[in-house]
């Protein structure tokens, strides 16, 4: 199925989603990669607030290229999500609702997604220019010294995504190949 969602996201918004469903996401999405995640953990360890509201938030693992004239952002393809696995359960426990990236996640992240009623969505890898078409605005909100890894506030419209991990334990990296093999077997 395809769903149309608006941030901030609630558990009720995410509960119907199943691995393999598609989503058109609109609203505010924050960008953060490895270095930004490390700094967020430092803030939390010091008892300080995060630089953006985490409750119901969506984080996109991306380091966009500089924007071209007349564009809000340059190419904005996803980075490998596994690099954020060490930080993710803590953010999910604080209310992070959605992560956007590519690639498999650790068992700890999968369990935390289920425990927190969250989702992990895939952006189209290798199609950064296509993904950028959905970005209406982009502003660096903290840590500009990180360059492309600075935390940005994106406003997106109909951002095309696929559910990889759902709130019920569904995992497209497991169910997808199994469905393919079953379909292939039925043809022979």
Model-derived regions: residue spans:
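Short, structured beta-strand/loop micro-motifs enriched in basic residues and often containing a Trp
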Residues: 1-9
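Feature captures the catalytic cores and cofactor-binding loops of soluble hydro-lyases/lyases
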Residues: 31-159
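C-terminal binding/interaction regions
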Residues: 25, 133-188
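A broadly conserved detector of short glycine/acidic/proline-rich loop/turn motifs that flank catalytic sites
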Residues: 9, 29, 64-66, 158, ...
């Amino acid at each position: 199925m395809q769903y149309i969602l608006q941030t901030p996201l609630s558990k009720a918004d995410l509960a119907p989603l199943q691995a393999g469903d598609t989503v058109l996401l609109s609203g505010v999405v924050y960008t953060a990669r490895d270095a930004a995640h490390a700094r967020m953990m430092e803030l939390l360890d010091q008892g300080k607030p995060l630089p953006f509201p985490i409750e119901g938030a969506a984080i996109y693992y991306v380091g966009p290229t500089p924007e071209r004239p007349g564009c809000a952002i340059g190419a904005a393809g996803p980075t490998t999500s596994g690099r954020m696995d060490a930080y993710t359960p803590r953010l999910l426990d604080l209310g992070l609702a959605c992560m956007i990236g590519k690639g498999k996640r650790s068992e700890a992240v999968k369990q935390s997604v289920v425990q927190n009623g969250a989702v992990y969505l895939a952006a189209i890898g290798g199609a950064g220019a296509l993904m950028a078409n959905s970005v209406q605005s982009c502003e660096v909100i903290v840590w500009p010294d990180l360059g492309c890894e600075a935390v940005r506030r994106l406003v997106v419209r109909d951002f095309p995504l696929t559910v990889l991990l759902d709130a019920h334990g569904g995992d497209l990296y497991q169910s997808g190949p199994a469905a393919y093999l079953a379909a292939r077997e039925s043809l022979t």
